[in-house]
Each structure stands twice: as C-alpha cells, then as structure tokens.
C-alpha cells in the first residue's frame, strides 16, 4: 500500500463514523472548552465577519470533540455528529444562521391538524426546529423522510429522545415514480446523497401523492424539500389538478 492509499484510508476513517444509537443521552457531553466555544458561536450574528469567526472556532471545537456531541438545540435533546455531515455541524455551532427565515415560515403554518412533510430530512433539523410550535396544536404531524440508513438511525435516535414531539420518521426517498433506486453519497458529507440508477445503497422510492395516500393525508400545510437538485423532478408530478385538494 503506497502513501496515497494510506492517507485516503485514514481520511475515510475520519468520515465513516459509526452511529451510536445505544448509549444514553449525555454520554457525549461537551468538555469545558467545546461547551464555551458553542456558547460563543451560537451568540454571534450572521454578518461575514461573524461567519468567519464561527468557522474558525468550530474547527477548533471539532478538533477537541468526540465523534458526536449531546446538546440541547431547538428546545430538544439532540445527538449531533461533528464530522461527515455539514448540516449537523452548522446547526450544532450556529443554529441562528441555519436557514432561519425558512424555518420560521414553516413554523408559522402550524395550526390544528397541520401536516408538515420534511423531504430529505437528514437528521431532522428542520423537523425539530419547528416541532415546538406544532406540538402546541391538536392532531399535528411532522413527517421526516430520509432514505440514508445512517442518517435515518441518527434521526430515529433523536426522535426517541423527544418522543413527546409530533415527529414521525420514515426511511423513504420521495421520487417521481415508485420503485427501488440507488443512493450515492460522498463520505465527507452524508447529507449530499444523490439518487441514481446504480450505486452503493439501495433505497425505496415513492411519489409524494402515493405517500400522502398511504398516510391518509388530506391536506399538507408545508413542505421542505432538499434532494440535491432533484426537486423539480419530485414535485412537478405532484403539483397537478387532481392533487389540488392536498395543497
């Protein structure tokens, strides 16, 4: 094995972090240095200089961190991983600049019987961020849909930590047609997976209208979709006149 291969293997070991969904919450408590950095980065603003400072401090904190951290975020107990998923790192250290306007809009749609569908949920950050508002109303549901097996395990673990919230994880890929597809994911960012006809991970795909029928959904209050450039292909078959009653 030459030097290049050794370096490549070491990099994969950094990114391929096993999912710990067995240990109790609190097992990965931040040490004093990391806790202080998180407190600082979460208090900073959204201007360029603040973002640069957050980036620098985040790198320092990750260096001194374990593979994941147990934290309170969005008024929920969450276990977030420090490597291999950009979304988790951003939310962990700087939730104030984590698409706040979009999350506030989705939260504003909450009322009795509201349904929010989080397509490409990753570890459920959008779902958890709005769930505190949705739980205030009767018969609300947040469907967090994520096909990647490791991300889904993390999502399910966090949902179990917060079982009082109306979040319902489903391991499924919303697609333009039903069937089995493949998910190709870069090891350095699990949240960047793309659906294709061949690849590493086989996932089940289902059109949004089919999913709504299976779950007995009559009206959708809000949808968030992040499927790495496949958004139009997924949504256009759904936005037709015969589905008008759903939205």
Where are these regions (language model features)?
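Phosphate/nucleotide-binding beta-alpha loop and adjacent structural elements of enzyme active sites
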Residues: 5-247
């Amino acid at each position: 094995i030459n030097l290049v291969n050794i370096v490549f293997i070491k990099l994969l070991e950094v990114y391929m972090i096993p999912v710990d969904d067995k240990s109790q919450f609190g097992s990965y408590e931040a040490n004093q240095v990391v806790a202080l950095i998180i407190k600082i980065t979460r208090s900073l603003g959204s201007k360029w200089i603040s973002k640069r400072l957050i980036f620098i401090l985040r790198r320092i904190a990750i260096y001194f961190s374990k593979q994941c951290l147990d934290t309170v975020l969005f008024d929920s107990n969450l276990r977030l991983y420090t490597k291999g998923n950009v979304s988790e790192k951003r939310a962990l250290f700087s939730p104030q600049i984590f698409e706040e306007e979009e999350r506030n809009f989705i939260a504003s749609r909450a009322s009795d019987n509201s349904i929010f569908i989080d397509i490409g949920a990753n570890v459920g950050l959008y779902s958890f961020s709005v769930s505190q508002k949705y739980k205030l109303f009767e018969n609300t549901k947040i469907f967090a849909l994520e096909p990647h097996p490791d991300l889904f395990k993390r999502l399910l673990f966090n949902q179990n930590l917060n079982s009082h919230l109306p979040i319902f994880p489903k391991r499924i890929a919303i697609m333009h047609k039903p069937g089995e597809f493949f998910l190709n994911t870069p090891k350095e960012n699990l949240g960047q997976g793309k659906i294709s006809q061949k690849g590493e991970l086989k996932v089940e795909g289902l059109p949004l209208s089919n999913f709504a029928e299976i779950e007995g959904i009559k009206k959708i209050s809000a949808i968030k979709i992040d499927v790495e450039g496949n958004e139009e292909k997924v949504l256009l078959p759904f936005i037709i006149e015969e589905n008008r009653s759903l939205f």
